[in-house]
């Protein structure tokens, strides 16, 4: 039993990170503190001043632990890492944690490529961006490939390496085939130099050169070549026009503000790149009643910039807490000075007010759509209840599916729809443990047995400890179970429920010969739902989602198994080094051929690891 009084009394008077856990040992909140003793004790005292979210969290805390750090900045870095690792339910977790795309020129390769990436790493490549307009970035890269004969393949091509047969791109004059040794590293480098100049907006000579070549070809009556050069010139002009939007002599700045109603908040970020607003993002933060604006924005900054690949020089916010600490952390992340300012007047203040107004509009639209969707989903569930003949409206629906290929890497999936919407946080995956071969019925029996056994155990634990249902992973039972299959799968589910003395209606989702949803099996009867477009769309959506979730997990296990058979058997090669090797060399075949010196150039590969790889593959050659 966790002794709260003793643990609170003995908290250290130092900076660090505290980790709150529920009765199941799951991490539900991670926070950092300048003085651990003061911060952690606050949660268990003066509850009148707590926000509704904090009150709900404290009710679910069964124990806590802490990690002492040397400084507050270390605590902040550790906090961000632990939030990424555990994704605690009471921390602000941005649902749209995407990186904005960069244009990447792989200068660390003998024959560089121009690609789109969302991750910026120190690997010797040149990066341009980030750009919020994803489609514009892809269009720019496509245009660059039309203008310059640059390779697009992922092959590991080395100067003076083994020559291979060139692909179709060479024959249609989209690549100069460095893979076949048809262009030198120096000649290829000159092409890349021109391409980089065009992307950066610093070299528009290429347009003039293309125009001169086009006119020359036209005079020589080589109209096919002239037309090709004309298309390249127009593409180059289009690239230059795009760069005018994103290249200039202005600073890059982000502006952050929020609007809160009585329950939730909308945080909005406007991105200024080279003096122009080039994009914006909004994030709905739920259950913020009672929290002040500075705390929400401070938490948002930590979450947002720990995920994004790009940190601007200046960030302007409408409020904020621990700004000096956040500035120091972002400065470390960026590698140069970052300032967070709260403008009080002038143009910057006007932009912040504009961001705030947009946050209000976005939150209001979100609530209106939420209400509209809620009414629509309610109507669908009511109609489905009547058509199928259920006794009650199914507010919570669980759907199950099995995925395998000839019994290998067999997995099961459980997805959840609440009030007609997916509840991703309650999705669960099961690796089949007791069934050998392709036996979907026994596999389904196993995952349902595990699901409801865990659920009943959690319910008993929660009742005994007087906790809320949110403390468990399986303790909330559905109002309806949907099986991806016919009568056989339905009967398996009913048998499992009977064993546990649980009464939940079970339906089967059946498809026609074209693999389209056809009807619902309930009480051994097939109910035709084709005439009701809303119901069939909903059931199809559930069926597609449970299948997607199952097959995604199956593929991840299959890929892991395939990779494990080779790289994971090599001493000193863990997951991080495995990924680095595949990223650097492109394939296992290229890793096998790599020399010790080439391996040493791979990020994270040290002398011992390189020797281990060489030794492993030499040994396999003799097998």
From Swiss-Prot:
Residues 204-239 form the UVR domain. The keyword Secreted does not apply. It is found in: Cytoplasm. Keywords: Cytoplasm, DNA damage, DNA excision, DNA repair, Excision nuclease, SOS response. Gene3D superfamilies: 5' to 3' exonuclease, C-terminal subdomain, GIY-YIG endonuclease, UVR domain, UvrC, RNAse H endonuclease domain. Belongs to the UvrC family. The UvrABC repair system catalyzes the recognition and processing of DNA lesions. UvrC both incises the 5' and 3' sides of the lesion. The N-terminal half is responsible for the 3' incision and the C-terminal half is responsible for the 5' incision. This is UvrABC system protein C. It comes from Clostridium acetobutylicum (strain ATCC 824 / DSM 792 / JCM 1419 / IAM 19013 / LMG 5710 / NBRC 13948 / NRRL B-527 / VKM B-1787 / 2291 / W). The lineage of its organism: Bacteria, Bacillati, Bacillota, Clostridia, Eubacteriales.
